[in-house]
Amino acid sequence: MGLHLGQAIFLLFAAGIAGTLNALAGGGSFISFPALLFVQVPGVTANSTNTVALWPGLVASTIAYLKRLKAPLRVLFPLLVASAAGGGAGARLLLKTPQHTFLRLVPWLLLGGTLLFAFGNSIRAIAGKTTVIDDLRHTSWQAIMASSIAQLLVAVYGGYFGAGIGFMTLGMLAMLGMRDIHAMGAIRTLLAAAINAAAVVTFIVAHAVLWPQCTVMIAGSLAGGWFGAHYAQKADPRKVRGVVIGVGLAMSAYFFAKVL
């Protein structure tokens, strides 16, 4: 399908905002995914195109956070493998979902992601009833295995839809005993990039991406992701979260009205 200038500008700004939000607090898909639906992209194709478009922004955020990434390889590697495996599985599941079925799932997915985002700190608090061990060098293999299984489940959801996975990952890291939010943010963005990398490859191989729309959004998400990662510490996270939750609820209500 074609792309008009007005649509291109709209998608560029939507992806820029989404990339910034993903770096600041997560939840960027609450902006960029509905934006694709608003320009008449079919549901499954909109989701796959959105995933590919936002991935470069995640990579940009990951690079910006590298100085905070201090987790040992024995912890990171199993989590990365689980992320990639789950992301690919979730993406393949999405491609097998009929368009009309997915469109009926959209408001539920948006609402579920919004609630997960809204109560993410509570999830972290519940998961974090453990000894504080921001130094992960002495993490037991049992803890690493349990966290990897949890991350695999997060990644399947992430490959399928993905809104709210950041807080699920933060909850998993809290289970390991981490408390340094910036160190946790660095791992969160890395694992999200791994989840979406597997999904991106799956979608591209399956020819499930609208490239005119995707290319415009990649430019926006790159700029937004880099900006958000560098200015994350200056933003008031409570205000950012409030905006994201408000948008998520509004989008959920809009799509519920469309399908009911």
PLM features: what roles do these ranges have?
Residues 1-42, 129-185, 215:
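Selected transmembrane alpha-helices and immediately adjacent juxtamembrane segments
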Residues 8, 51, 106-110, 114, ...:
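Residues within membrane-spanning alpha-helices of integral membrane proteins
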Residues 41-51, 74-75, 178-189:
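Membrane-interface alpha-helices at helix entry/exit sites of multi-pass transporters
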Residues 48-108, 196-246:
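Selective hydrophobic functional segments
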Residues 60-70, 91, 108-136, 252-260:
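Transmembrane helix exit motif
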Residues 90, 151-160, 199-207, 214, ...:
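Hydrophobic alpha-helical transmembrane segments in multi-pass integral membrane proteins
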Residues 112, 186-199:
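Hydrophobic alpha-helical transmembrane segments of multi-pass integral membrane proteins
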